[in-house]
């Protein structure tokens, strides 16, 4: 088994003027992570995230109804959505995020059942980029065995990758299940499949690199989104962002 864990924090500090009052929440602006439980209203509304900066990824799940996991990511923007439990490409619809980018205090949900059915409970997980700790970003695959290098500014311990523009699994890498390069022990977040070894990926001191032309992480011309979290949540010099050393 493997477990990945995020610590939130304070249960005070709602900022802005949200139109939907959370049922419960935990904010950690230092690590750029928060969790918010809320009851849907069935109409477009705003919720607090407590991060002090606009979140770069938001994952929402209905708790009482059968709905897909809805994902917002800043590289693709609020006109798009993608589903964590499916391998499909991103969709375009205003009914998810109301075509409204998150602000430093609030994020918006519209009327889609995956994010805002009246009287039903939801949980939202928000992630903001923090230098030396976490990063949401995107890259373009090159389809070569000498694949793309992705700069994060830190040595990742956890990497979640999805081809946003094609049918492809959500691919998970970490530094515990194999622990050395090339890291090819993968899990697929959108299936119940056992661990596989389809890819070669190097975890480096300042990012990660695909050493494979495997389409799920390096399809030529495809746009990939990712969430990466650091092994050591620090930098040697905050101003210049010097990363921790390689393994």
How does the language model describe each region?
Residues 1-247:
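Surface-exposed molecular-recognition determinants
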């Amino acid at each position: 088994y493997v477990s990945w864990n995020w610590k939130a924090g304070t249960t005070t500090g709602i900022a802005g003027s949200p139109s939907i009052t959370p049922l419960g929440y935990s904010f950690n602006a230092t690590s750029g992570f928060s969790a918010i439980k809320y009851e849907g209203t069935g109409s477009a509304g705003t919720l607090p995230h407590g991060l002090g900066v606009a979140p770069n990824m938001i994952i929402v799940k209905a708790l009482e109804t059968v709905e897909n996991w809805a994902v917002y990511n800043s590289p693709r923007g609020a006109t798009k959505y993608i589903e964590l439990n499916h391998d499909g490409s991103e969709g375009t619809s205003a009914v998810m995020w109301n075509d409204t980018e998150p602000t430093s205090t609030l994020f918006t949900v519209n009327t889609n059942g995956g994010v805002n059915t009246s009287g039903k409970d939801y949980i939202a997980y928000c992630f903001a980029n923090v230098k030396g700790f976490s990063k949401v970003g995107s890259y373009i695959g090159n389809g070569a065995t000498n694949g793309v290098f992705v700069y994060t500014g830190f040595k990742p311990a956890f990497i979640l990758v999805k081809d946003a523009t094609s049918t492809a699994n959500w691919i998970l890498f970490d530094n515990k299940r194999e622990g050395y390069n090339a890291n090819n022990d993968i899990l697929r977040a959108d299936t119940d499949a056992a661990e596989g070894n389809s890819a070669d990926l190097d975890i480096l001191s300042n990012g990660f690199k695909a050493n494979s032309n495997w389409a799920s992480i390096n399809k030529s011309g495809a746009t990939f989104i990712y969430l990466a979290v650091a092994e050591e949540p620090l930098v040697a010099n905050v101003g210049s962002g010097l990363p921790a050393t390689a393994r």
